[in-house]
Amino acid sequence: MTDKSYHLSQPTYKMIVEENIMVTARDGVKLAVDVYRPDAPGEFPGLFTISVYGKSTQTFDTPPQPFGGSVFEAAIEAGDPEFFVARGYCMVIADYRGIGDSEGEMPGMFSKYEGEDGYDIIEWMAEQPWCNGNIGGVGICYFGFTQLIIAETQPPHLKCIAPWE
């Protein structure tokens, strides 16, 4: 895709941040999420990702990295909330159970809870007044892998996933 005729959407919105909102999983465990959303009324499409590293590590003020650089040169694997929210998306970054501010014990990587917890949070997002119910998964590396696990559970409001790297 070398044609330069594509157009990148322009930033339109400022961002509202709501930290450590607790979402109840199907087994009663409370999962901590941070919500990033446009500062305007209305419903917006959603983006979701879940972190085994702690959601707070995904919003460092990291300067742009050089093209072709390694993923290890960047801190944000979830995607940049400021970029997406400014363009009309709401974004939720969650702590995996037993990690960061979420309750419970971490059952280990690649457990059934990654899919179930992702499903439950996506469906919670769809019920919020700021989300239009169209939700996509985003992220690189482990964040990309968890999208596959979550998609396998077939949340009704998950419309697409975009794992990369």
Residue ranges and their predicted role:
Residues 33-36, 50, 94, 138-140, ...:
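Generic beta-strand/beta-sheet core signal
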Residues 12, 38, 83, 127-129, ...:
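A general structural signal for stabilizing positions within well-ordered secondary structure
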Residues 31-35, 76-79, 144-149:
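Short alpha-helical segments and helix-capping/turn motifs at coil-helix boundaries
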Residues 46, 123-165:
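Primarily recognizes the serine-hydrolase "nucleophile elbow" in alpha/beta-hydrolase
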Residues 41-126:
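Cap/lid segment of the alpha/beta-hydrolase catalytic domain
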